[in-house]
Amino acid sequence: MQQAAPAAIQNDRNPMTRLLLTCLLAAAAPAFGRTLDGFDDPSAWQVVASDQVSAQLRAVPGRDGGKALCLDYDFNGVSGHAGLQRELPLAYPDNYRFAFALRGDSPRNDLQFKLIDAGGDNVWWVNRPHYAFPRDWTEVAYKRRQIDKAWGPDPERTLRRSARVEFTIYNRVGGRGSVCFDDLRLEPLPAGDASPLVATASADPAAATAAAVTDDDPATAWAGRFDARHPPRLTLDLGKPREFGGLSLQWGGAGYASRYRVELSDDGRSWRRVREVGDGDGGSDWVALPESEARWLRLTLLGGPAPGFALRQARVEPLAFAATPNDFIASVAKASPRGRFPRGFSGEQPYWTIVGVDGGLDQGLIGEDGAIELAKGGFSIEPFVQVGGRTVDWAGVTSTQSLQDGYLPIPSVHWAHPDFALDVTAFAEGDAAHSRLWARYRLTNTGTAARDYVLALALRPWQVNPPTQFLNTPGGWSPIRHLALDAGGGTVDAGDGQNPARRVRLLQAPASVAAASFDAGEIAARLAEGRVPPAAAAAQTEDAAVSY
C-alpha cells in the first residue's frame, strides 16, 4: 500500500491474531511403520499443564474403530500450556518420520510436538503457531528435517535418542477446547536426496523451444500464443519423485502469463492442482510450494496482457526455498536489491525498541530503520521516499536513533540523505486496557532548491520482530489477507481474514492509495519501478500477503 503524503498515523487497538504458520505434510494415507502408541490406554499418558490451566484426558472412539485419546483444556484466562506426555524411549535411524491422526474442536492455539531426552533438559520439537485444528480425523506427519532443537544445554542439535514424547497446546489465543490423538507411528525413510533438481521440459502444443526454460540462457525462451480453448502447457520432468519447495519463473518483456495454474503428478497422468495465479505482473515470479513431492510439474498458461508469451526460465526450487513463510520471504529477498526487504530477511541483525503504555495489554515496535509494528506479532508500516525519479529505502540512507529529550520513552528514527531528511517518531497513549499507537513522519528538504517529494508508507506482511525470533512470539511473517482502503476517510483496515482487522487512521488525507497482492508484484519493487496501481483499483484487495 502506498500513502503519498506525510501523515501521523493512529492505530486503534483491535485484537488481531497472526495467521497460522503451517508447514506439515498431510495425507490420507494408510498406517505405516512402527506403531508407537495407539492411544488405547489412557494410563500410559499424564497431563502436563502450567499453573491455573485446567486439563484432563478422555477416551473416545478412534479413527479406525479402536480407541483414541482427547485432551480437554481450559486456559481460564491465563497464559500457559496444556499437554499430554508419556515415557517412550526411542533411538532414531538416519532418516525417519513421525505420523499420527489428529482432530479437534479448539481455538487456533499453537500445536507443539516435543521429544525430550532422559534428563528432561534437552527438547526437540515441531512448533505450529495458530494451528487450524481439523474437525475430522486428519493424518499429520513430521519428517526428520522438520524436527528442530528447541532448547537445552547439550550442543548436539541432531536428535539421536529421546526418552519422552509430548503433545502440547500452547496458549496463543486462549479459550478452551478439545484435541484428540490416535495412532502415533515412526517410519524409517531412505536417505534424503540432496542432489540438484534437474528437469527436462516439454510443451503442449509441442514446441522445440520448450527446452529453453531449463538451459540457464536468458536470451532463449519458450514462446507461443495464448489459446482459451487449448491453453499452452509446459511440463517439467524431474526424472523421479523428488521433494521440492517451489518454482521460480522468469518472463520475457511484455509477453507473460498473468493467469496460470501449477499442477503436480506422480505418474504423468493424474494431476493435482497446487497453486493458481490470477494477477501476475511478469518479470520474476516466485511460487511457494512448501513440502511438495512429485516427479512432474505442469504449468498451464491461461492468459496475459498480450496475445503471446515468452518464458525464459522455469526452475524447480529446493525444499529450503519455502520450508516456512519466513524462508520464502528470505529467498525472494536474496534475489532482490538490498533495502526492499527488512534486514532480518537478509541475514543482518536488526535492532528495535518497544512502544506501549505501562502495563498495556498490547505493544508495538519501532525498528532501527523506521518500520513500525503496530501490535505484538502484527504487520508493519515501512517508509519510502521518492525524489528525483528514484525511490529511496532504508539501504539508501544513514539512520540514527534517539529518545525524546534523551530519556523519555518516545523513540525516533532519523534518515539522512543528500536530498532530504526523514524523522519517524512513535509513541503510545491511553491506559493498560485501551491504548493507541501514534506515529509521526516529518519529511524535510535539506537542499537549497525546491523539489517534489512523495512519502510512501507501505503496509507489509511481516513484523519488525525479526524471523530469527522463534520462541514465544515467532518473528517475521505476519500475513495481511484483506485490505480495505478508504482514501476519503483516511482509513485502512487490514487483517488476516479471520480475526478483527486493525484500523490505521491517517490524520492527513493521502494524495493517493494503492494496494496489490504479492502475485501482482511486491510493493517495494512496484514503488521502485513506478508501477503503482491506480487508486480506483485498490479500494479493496484479498490475499495481500506473501502467497504461501
Regions found by a protein language model. Give the residues of each.
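Disordered, acidic Ser/Thr/Pro-rich linker "stalks" and the adjacent N-terminal cap
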Residues: 61-63, 72, 188-244, 250-260, ...
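Extracellular carbohydrate-recognition regions
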Residues: 32-52, 188-205
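Extracellular ligand-binding interfaces
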Residues: 75-154, 170, 174-180, 248-277
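Short carbohydrate-recognition loop motifs
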Residues: 57-80
